[in-house]
Amino acid sequence: MSEVKFVKPKNVSGHFLKIKCKDCGNVQVVFARPSSVVTCNICGATIAKPTGGVLETSGEVIESL
């Protein structure tokens, strides 16, 4: 089983981000500084996790809102 790689997005200008799930392609809006793990509404994969600051994401950041 391969490990999912999480990265911090650069230049987060808004409070919310549109993130695309790597597993199913679903796009959902996520708070940029979450206090809990964020899972995909469609497939249940973890797409973001808290770090005490800006989130770490396993998906692709589409847009900063």
Swiss-Prot record:
Zn(2+) binds at C21, C24, C40, C43. Its cofactor is Zn(2+). The keyword Coiled coil does not apply. GO terms for cellular component: ribonucleoprotein complex; ribosome. Pfam families: Ribosomal_S27e. NCBIfam families: PRK00415.1 (NF001629). This is Small ribosomal subunit protein eS27. The gene is rps27e.
